[in-house]
Curated annotation (Swiss-Prot):
Name listed for the protein in its UniProt record: Glycerol-3-phosphate dehydrogenase [NAD(P)+]
Pathway entry: Membrane lipid metabolism; glycerophospholipid metabolism
A GO molecular-function annotation: glycerol-3-phosphate dehydrogenase [NAD(P)+] activity
Subcellular localization, as worded in the UniProt entry: Cytoplasm
Active site: K192 (proton acceptor)
Keywords in alphabetical order: Cytoplasm, Lipid biosynthesis, Lipid metabolism, NAD, NADP, Nucleotide-binding, Oxidoreductase, Phospholipid biosynthesis, Phospholipid metabolism
Function, in words: Catalyzes the reduction of the glycolytic intermediate dihydroxyacetone phosphate (DHAP) to sn-glycerol 3-phosphate (G3P), the key precursor for phospholipid synthesis.
Protein family membership: Belongs to the NAD-dependent glycerol-3-phosphate dehydrogenase family.
Keyword Nucleus listed: no
A Pfam family per the record: NAD_Gly3P_dh_N
Class in the EC hierarchy, top level: oxidoreductase
């Protein structure tokens, strides 16, 4: 029976603890704030992030990193993307050399522009690549914790790791597919948050379903362009970790990025919005990296650029939407036009 350590006691870390403990695995849930972890351990409930859901008695919650990682066969990283490096550096002395590393964070590191697998390799060394996997897809913690049917993707450089994680997580309510495209799966999870901010902004401005559908669809084109430039496979973005996660993040009431966008569209500043959400909004960080990379690589990302301008360049959201609608006319899918000779 494997021992599983989950780093991160937020909503997603807690939901994964519930899922894995339902299979009678030994699960330790680590959180950095001692008072919060003590409350989890004593009350058997994550009142801040998943109120009303009882934790299994077999889940052990602790703020002691050494205790959490001791003897762990599987280490699940469920901390915010901007915290991953710091947590890994603290965890490194206690990590087993053969532990499988499962990342569930969705973002890009602001300072380096790295994907999460690259951050892991940078901190733990190249050998960590051999045991790394990323789990991503449309999986709001609020639904996973309540056993609402969910499907998701695991990617790894080595199929044995992917199969291991697939078997680990599969339940009658949680289906896991495998994919060898680590970069694509990571990028789909990171980039969709920007588009969700955009659809939220449109909703906050009072625009309807047509506008949001257009932003989602054209946003997918931007995700594919940037994703391919950063090493992902185009087909991956048509899967669960791509369009699947994009759809749920752009449309769900559980989506922090969409909710943040709505508030910004209603006129709140980014600072006011983040304070009101009171949880990590990954898209607000990822957009800074993507805007920088788009400029460096000269990749056309009009929706992402518009969102960046609203969040960080003091532009009015309605003006950015107007500018998007007035862009130079073009074909919808250039690749099809190129194949149609004489069109």
């Amino acid at each position: 029976m494997p021992k599983i350590c989950i780093l991160g006691s937020g909503s997603w870390g807690t939901a994964q603890a519930l899922l894995l403990s339902s299979k009678e695995f030994q699960v330790i849930l680590w959180g950095r704030i001692e008072d919060g972890v003590d409350s989890l351990q004593q009350d058997r409930e994550n009142r801040r992030f998943l109120p009303g859901i009882r934790l299994s008695d077999t889940i052990v919650a602790t703020s002691d990193l050494a205790r959490a990682l001791k003897g762990a066969d599987i280490v699940v990283m469920a901390v915010p993307s901007q915290s991953l490096r710091e947590v890994l550096e603290k965890a490194r002395p206690y990590l087993g050399k053969d532990s499988c590393l499962v990342n569930t964070a969705k973002g890009l590191e602001i300072s380096s522009g790295m994907r999460m697998s690259q951050v892991v390799e940078d901190v733990l060394g190249k050998q960590s690549r051999e045991r790394y996997a990323v789990l991503s897809g449309p999986s709001h913690a609020e639904e996973v914790a309540r056993n609402i049917p969910t499907a998701i993707t695991v990617a790894s450089y080595h199929k044995e790791n992917a199969f291991l994680v697939q078997d680990l997580y599969m339940t009658p309510f949680f289906r896991v597919y495998t994919n060898p495209d680590v970069a694509g799966v990571e990028l789909g999870g990171a980039l969709k948050n920007i588009i969700a901010l955009g659809t939220g902004i449109a909703s906050g401005l009072g625009y309807g379903d047509n506008t949001q559908a257009a932003l989602l669809t054209r946003g997918l084109h931007e995700i594919i362009r940037m994703g391919e430039a950063m090493g992902g496979e185009a087909r991956t973005f048509s899967g669960l970790s791509g369009i699947g996660d994009l759809v749920v993040t752009c449309s769900s009431r559980h989506s922090r990025n969409r909710q943040a966008g709505i508030l910004i569209g209603q006129g709140y500043s980014l600072e006011e919005t983040l304070k009101q959400i009171a949880m990590v909004v990954e898209g607000a960080h990822t957009i800074r990296v993507v805007h920088r990379l788009a400029c460096q690589l000269r990749i056309d990302m009009p929706i992402c650029t518009a969102c960046y301008n609203v969040l960080y360049a003091n532009r009015k959201a309605r003006d950015e939407v107007d500018d998007l609608m007035r862009r130079q006319k073009k074909h919808e899918i250039e690749e099809i036009v190129k194949r149609k000779k004489g069109w």
